[in-house]
Amino acid sequence: MIDFVKSRDTVIQKSFFEEFNSQNREMGSFAYSGNSESVWTGENITSIWKTILINETGSYCVAARPMTMDGAEFNLDLMGYSVSEDQINNDEIGIWNYISVAEMGGVLLFLSYWIWTCLHFSKIIFPAQKVICLYIFLFALNQTLQECIEEYVFSSECIKYRQFYSVYEIIDFLRTNFYRLFVIYCALGFGITRTVPKYLMIKGISIVIALCSVYWISLYKDVYVVSEIFDMIQYEVSPAIWVYSICHLLKQCTSVTTYENASKARFFRRMLNAFIFIFCASPMLHYLSNIIFGNFDYRLSVIIGDLFTFMEKIAFPCYIMFPTHNEALAYNRNVAEEAQEKMI
């Protein structure tokens, strides 16, 4: 059913529950101003938000209402799962907020520990291990924005939600592609056992920034075709990068002729095992998260999904690249150099 809601604001942006709750809105058949302009805007899975732009003050906005007059008794179909209003708007919501803050604090604490470790092993640190600090920072910023968006989705306090969500999308796109760039560079050994060629990192980051710029323009200008193309490319490119990295690591592990190469082989073998585990376990973890989402509390499923993401994106890369592993490489490199000098 279609209803008309009277408004005096130039921009109206309310939550799904407030729009459809009959107790919080004005009901009735109002006159519609033909000179006003109404625009419906949805943001991917958060299309429960709507922005209606009005040219003239005192005009009327079109809104939809459920068939039942009791707007509180309905389920929200969110990402294919039925979530009732009581699961999101309840008195115990503060507990989940504290848990979310604890998650962010844990990520920032882990970032601080990683920075301290890099400073402690500064003499034998790899360039790739310094880059991890930037990636963890992007991950923490991305998760923080995600938590803020989830808070604003079900409230009417966010006036510029669309711009806020675009910033989150760009940072998430940047973090994802930066992670893929880091994976392929590590698989090739750059910044670990091979020196980084001049301007190689700059070229890679420039490509990522250029892709982010095009993606941002597509979001800001509502070019959803470009967004869909980018999403399709991401889903196709990511498995290809993982498969190529795994194949290249298999090749690296076969070189065991000297002490140094033996140490490299152990290092790359550890990286190979982690890459295979992440590549195989990632779809299973996401599937398990979706099952939890459909059968348990919405907030609980989000927290478990964040835990899986932390293990996949942060814990395993940091385990592989932990600076204490550098001592074996440095030691065996010196042994190989001394053996070569004795032969000369």
Swiss-Prot record:
What are the subcellular locations of this protein?
Endoplasmic reticulum; Membrane
Signal peptide positions (record): none
Q: Which UniProt keywords apply?
A: Endoplasmic reticulum, Membrane, Transmembrane, Transmembrane helix
Q: How does it sit in the membrane?
A: Multi-pass membrane protein
Parts of the chain that traverse the membrane: 99-119, 121-141, 199-219, 223-243, 274-294
Q: Pfam families from the xrefs?
A: Pombe_5TM
Entry protein name? Uncharacterized membrane protein SPBC1348.02
